[in-house]
Amino acid sequence: MATSEELKQLRCDCTYRSKLAEQAERYDEMADAMRTLVEQCVNNDKDELTVEERNLLSVAYKNAVGARRASWRIISSVEQKEMSKANVHNKNVAATYRKKVEEELNNICQDILNLLTKKLIPNTSESESKVFYYKMKGDYYRYISEFSCDEGKKEASNCAQEAYQKATDIAENELPSTHPIRLGLALNYSVFFYEILNQPHQACEMAKRAFDDAITEFDNVSEDSYKDSTLIMQLLRDNLTLWTSDLQGDQTEEKSKDEGLE
């Protein structure tokens, strides 16, 4: 059993290693460092992550998954083109490669979901952190649903919606409408409605409500939150423009914007 001093040193070392890995753009190793920190150091609500640690965790997994999500989209597109050309051999090669990326994606998503479910969510008492972690849980189940099929897709989608809704219930009661975490949640939850559930009207309604609520209270936005809040509000507005255009029958190849790295 490690002493409190040893755990404190481990926490500092993991944070430093994570920052080094981020500077070197080695995001898998950044995630490894933050996983070690969470597994070894978060055992009750007195041990919960600082804002800096929480953000390092988020950046690590977001980038590790983001690169593979982009790869998956490219490979899937190539696979579809080979299929349309009836090139069975190349289509099969692309499919095998796609499945390899899907396995990597699934492993990373399950890794962070395990940390969220067993360590982070049970051991936090702060409303802001609860919203942050439930939003993350929704995001990573959403990513799983992007590449899953049939029952796997349905199960991941249900888990994502449940997590997003829990985050929303807390955020709407505990966080101001201009808070960047609440805005980011509305952004990603609305993308989930649009991209995964194929419910564009609900997506537009959610994004518009979040944007309008924030505009109403924008004079009260804190100086610390101003930059992040305005950026997310712009993404909400961009999506609303795109989705409204789609609903009016103007087809576009442009993809919805969320806080994930595309």
Swiss-Prot record:
It holds the Pfam family 14-3-3. Belongs to the 14-3-3 family. The keyword Mitochondrion does not apply. Signal peptide: none annotated. GO terms for biological process: protein localization; signal transduction. SMART domains: 14_3_3. Adapter protein which binds to its partners, usually via a phosphoserine or phosphothreonine motif. Binding generally results in the modulation of the activity and/or cellular localization of the binding partner. Via its interaction with CDPK1 and PKAr, involved in merozoite microneme secretion and thus in merozoite invasion of host erythrocytes. It comes from Plasmodium falciparum (isolate 3D7). GO terms for cellular component: cytoplasm; extrinsic component of plasma membrane; nucleus; protein-containing complex. Its main location: membrane. One of its GO terms (molecular function) is histone binding. Keywords: Cell membrane, Cytoplasm, Membrane, Nucleus. The lineage of its organism: Eukaryota, Sar, Alveolata, Apicomplexa, Aconoidasida. It is found in: Cell membrane; Cytoplasm; Nucleus. This is 14-3-3 protein I. Homodimer. Forms a complex composed of CDPK1, PKA regulatory subunit PKAr and 14-3-3I; the complex is formed in merozoites in response to low extracellular level of K(+) and may play a role in microneme secretion. Interacts with CDPK1 (when phosphorylated) in a Ca(2+)-independent manner; the interaction does not regulate CDPK1 catalytic activity but is required for merozoite invasion of host erythrocytes. Interacts with PKA regulatory subunit PKAr (when phosphorylated) in a Ca(2+)-dependent manner. InterPro entries: 14-3-3, 14-3-3_CS, 14-3-3_dom_sf, 14-3-3_domain. It is a peripheral membrane protein.
